[in-house]
Amino acid sequence: MSTAIEDPRAAARDDWARAATGQPDLALARASADAGFRSYWRATVPGQGSVVVMDSPPALEDVRPWLRMHDLLERGGVRVPRVLARDTDAGFLLLEDLGADTLLHVIDAGNADAHFDAAIDQLLRIQAIPAPDDLPHYDEALLGRELRLFDEWFLGRHLGVQPGCGDLEALDLAYRVLIDAALAQPRVLVHRDYMPRNLMPVDGGLAVLDFQDAVAGPVAYDPTSLFKDAFLSWPPERVEGWLLRYHARALDAGIPVPAAPERFLRDARLIGIQRHLKVLGIFARLHHRDGKPKYIADAPRFLAYLDDALPLHPELAPLAGVIERHVRPALATATAAAG
């Protein structure tokens, strides 16, 4: 039995790509998949070079939010992949091929300053674009739902920890601090996953990927995501230097960051703590619900970020206590069992 018969989606993808390129014999090869339901397929078009097909099954992941944000960013001067053909009903896009290596693959201690300057270039362009009135807001409800991913998926499902009433109260108090701090920040267009794996070196600069979940939210969110990455870590002193570099350039560009660098660094730490807790929950959910175990291996990185930030915020001592009482013992037990 042929692959096309076994997988109707594959047959539809092949047929669409061949029609879109005018190449009846076009062969697609998997390029990558992401943490959602989209997949990417590469092909070579004679006389034109390589192209990429984005496959976003409509019943699982609507392609329209991606396209809407793509077009908004492109109009604002942000470098994004060019869309060569689109079929929103079927969930297929034909994109320019930006290559196989994201910034995550090429950045290192020696070239990080130059690459992060290029990343700041694109981020300032994003933040200068007025957020559409109907764009979702990083509001109290969304911030709270994200924080509860830590309780449900990382503590409960992954570590098997069932916090008692006192622990839940401690988390509630800490979450209140984090939510209030986020809501007090100036609001801009927020990518929500602005980090090296979603940036592509191209044309002497960087192109931006994976922007479909953008919201209107805290100005410190994206720079914090950039320098406190999910997949690689930098010395704290370099992170602070890059945050201050971003802050100075943002002030010059008219982005509504606080004038005082110390206040901006505080905002970055607090929104970073919120993000680290959320990501721990998301990585655990990807592992246990979605069968994608590779992400949870980076959990220690986020605990290290929390170790750096929490001592600077005594108002978050209840959260630090929960981590000491429950997270570290559970991880130690799991590590011993695995060894």
Predicted regions located by residue number:
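Conserved NTP-binding catalytic cores of kinases and kinase-like/nucleotidyltransferase enzymes
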Residues: M1-F92, V188, V202-A207, I323-G339
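Active-site catalytic-loop/activation-segment of kinase and kinase-like phosphoryl-transfer enzymes
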Residues: A4-P8, Y138-L178, G241, R245, ...
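ATP-binding pocket architecture of kinase catalytic cores
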Residues: S32, R38-L143, R148-L149, F154-G160, ...
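Active-site acidic catalytic loop and adjacent metal/ATP-binding pocket
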Residues: F37-T44, V53, L93, I126, ...
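Secondary-structure capping and boundary motifs in well-ordered enzyme cores
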Residues: H115, P186, H191, V215-A216, ...
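Active-site activation/catalytic loop segments of kinase-like enzymes and analogous catalytic loops
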Residues: D151-H158, A220-P256, L270-D290, F302-L310
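Histidine/acidic-rich helix-loop-helix segments that form or flank divalent-metal centers
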Residues: V257-R266
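ATP/Mg2+ or Mg2+-diphosphate-binding catalytic cores
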Residues: V279-G339
